[in-house]
Amino acid sequence: MAGDLPSNGLISRNEPIAIVGAGPAGLACAILLARAGRKVVVREWHKTVGSRFHGDYQGLENWSGKRDVLDELNEAGIQTSFSAHPVFQGTAYDYRGKDYPIIGDRPLYYLVQRGGQKDSLEQGLLDQAVSVGVDIRFGERATSIEGPAVSAIGPRSADAIAAGYIFETDQADSNHIVFDNKLAPHGYAYLLVHNGRGTLASCMFSGFKNQAVHVARSVKFFEEKTGLKMNSPRAFGGFGNFRIPNTAMQGGHPLIGEQAGFQDMLAGFGMRYALRSGILAAQSLIDGTDYTRLWRAQLLPLLKIGISNRFLYNAAGDRGARLALRNISHSNASARLHRLYQPSLLTKIIFPLARRQFRRPLHDPSCDHIACQCVWCEHGVGHAD
């Protein structure tokens, strides 16, 4: 039973390990467990990977760590079996529409495509998992977990949403972001174009009820600033969940990715944290290292800094964002962004206040019952959509 598995206990090499959820975190964990000779079964209730996404472009951030994110993944045993286009520069805009060139001396992020199509992040990880012998079971709904397992079912509430369009275009490759509360309350709107395909979205941290208005304003803004013409636009949307878990364990099983709340609260980037949490969970199951200790050492400092940065960003408003853009545009953006995600006296002082202000978004809905076997807590049984 689930309660019989200690959180830091070694698992028999012959005992199958179940992973619930075939997102990036779950697949990364499965790949590393299989490479270590473990039998792995991934249970995914959708019929394919990437069902939450629609072929939209996203950024795999490359600023929170000292090392390049792809090097970090490769060293851990995750090959770059998906398309990852390095982005060194782009254009940012403030609330007045003034543009600022943003340039880094190393990739600011890697542009990846989300969904189940060829070359997407999810499909690349799936192909890699299958190649190392992972048993993938689609259309299999998990309502409880018994035996050694990892839970990776994704976000369970919407603390931020992104809504917009994916489309075809003749526009040249480009990357744009605008910080304007009229377009994206407490967030940002973005336009990413690569190889004749584009993604335009408003990423909102509040004002969800008026998302259609914010998206329409974002479209108009980028049409006026870049001459954008969208061909065959298709609407899409997504959401993210932020929190700091108590242990990121449930019933003796590691929780990884967005199910654990591992996402940057400032910018909403979560892929790097998700992949890293999958790597840490695999390590804990392979060598018996305590998973809670691992993620607290590698992810907790970043989560705390993200919360403090979010508090400061909200307090600064549009004018503060304008000043920040001015400073970043006159420096190496890679170094500036990396510095933003390092501990400082200010973020340490701000954190207790910020955590109190964001108490509800940071609430941990996981069950605290040691022997809990349910996949979805707060509190019910069933696999989340």
Regions found by a protein language model. Give the residues of each.
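Active-site-proximal substrate-binding core of FAD-dependent oxidoreductases
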Residues: P245, A267, Q283-L323
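N-terminal Rossmann-fold NAD(P) dinucleotide-binding loop
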Residues: G26-L27
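N-terminal FAD cofactor-binding segment of flavoenzymes
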Residues: G50-D94, A163
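Predominantly flavin-linked oxidoreductase catalytic cores and closely associated redox partners
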Residues: A22, H46, G116-R234, G240-T247, ...
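FAD/FMN-dependent oxidoreductases across multiple families
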Residues: P86, Q211-W295
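C-terminal auxiliary extensions adjacent to catalytic cores
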Residues: A316-D385
